């Protein structure tokens, strides 16, 4: 296996901070797993992609453990991990489930597959993110994107250790998040592109859960006071007016309830002429 399958260096993206390739490779037909809880489930999902059976008494082992500290990590230590691959086994050490999850994504990239064969490149890796926030913004306000496609995007982002999915939900063209208190926002007549397309409250909560499963933080954005033509069509009030701000405060209460499991709500404030100096401080 080590010859034809490992003739070239694996492509690792992003490149780990410290990566030493060895001459070993890991390719047993059976393996024992040492891990618990959520991490075991993630690990089993990866192993199901390979032609390998899980046998508790196998002499080949893959072990994932959470530790209090990893040495030699200068920043963002909560997402750091150490990964060791030899001919006898694989060891992952991290201080958090998120760090261990990133290690498993690296393990995926180290794996070469050819028919019913596979081989994992031997190495010693110590890795941590250079940036605390590694984000991707998806604008669904202008163009609705199906839940299935959004989930595919999030899954791909997590494979490359992107940890923030910024969800731009409102635009001049449409207000894409369901509102129970102001249903006119979702009326087709108030959307200038892809009318009638929006995300239900349950779908929004579902996407938050999906992001969490993939160690990605979802940050919802309700853009204000610019990019708000859809709001104006629905209410006939500018967001910066007294009436508009009163409506927005009620809407923000509703939006915060929808996204109660996430720590941030983005309010935009870009590309607009401010006519009300109290708008941003109040909102």
Regions found by a protein language model. Give the residues of each.
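Feature activates predominantly on carbohydrate-active enzymes
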Residues: 78-266, 273
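Residue-level preference for nonpolar/small residues embedded in alpha-helices
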Residues: 39-42, 149, 203, 279
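Active-site loop/helix belt of alpha/beta enzymes
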Residues: 268-283
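Acidic, contiguous N-terminal accessory segments
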Residues: 1-129
């Amino acid at each position: 296996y080590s010859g034809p399958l490992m003739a070239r260096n694996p492509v690792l993206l992003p490149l780990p901070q410290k990566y030493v390739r060895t001459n070993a490779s890991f390719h047993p037909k059976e393996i024992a797993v040492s891990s618990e809880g959520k991490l075991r489930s993630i690990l089993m999902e990866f192993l199901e992609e390979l032609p390998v059976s899980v046998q508790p008494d196998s002499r080949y082992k893959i072990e994932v453990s959470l530790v209090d500290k990893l040495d030699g990590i200068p920043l963002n230590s909560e997402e750091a991990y150490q990964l060791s691959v030899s001919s006898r086994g694989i060891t992952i050490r991290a201080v958090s489930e998120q760090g261990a999850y990133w290690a498993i994504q690296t393990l995926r990239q180290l794996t070469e597959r050819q028919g019913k064969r596979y081989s994992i490149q031997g190495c010693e890796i110590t890795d941590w993110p250079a940036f605390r926030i590694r984000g991707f913004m998806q604008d669904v306000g202008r163009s609705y994107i199906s839940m299935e496609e959004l989930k595919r995007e999030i899954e791909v982002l997590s494979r490359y250790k992107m940890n923030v999915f910024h969800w731009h939900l409102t635009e001049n063209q449409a207000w894409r998040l369901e509102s129970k208190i102001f249903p006119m926002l979702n009326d087709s007549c108030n959307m200038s592109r892809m009318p009638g397309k929006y995300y239900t409250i349950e779908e929004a909560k579902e996407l938050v859960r999906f992001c969490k499963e993939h160690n990605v933080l979802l940050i919802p954005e309700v853009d204000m006071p610019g990019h708000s033509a859809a709001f104006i069509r629905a209410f006939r009030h500018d967001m910066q007016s007294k009436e508009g701000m009163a409506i927005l405060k009620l809407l923000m209460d509703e939006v915060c309830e929808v996204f109660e499991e996430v720590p941030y709500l983005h309010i935009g404030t870009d590309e607009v002429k401010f006519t009300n100096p109290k708008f941003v401080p109040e909102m």
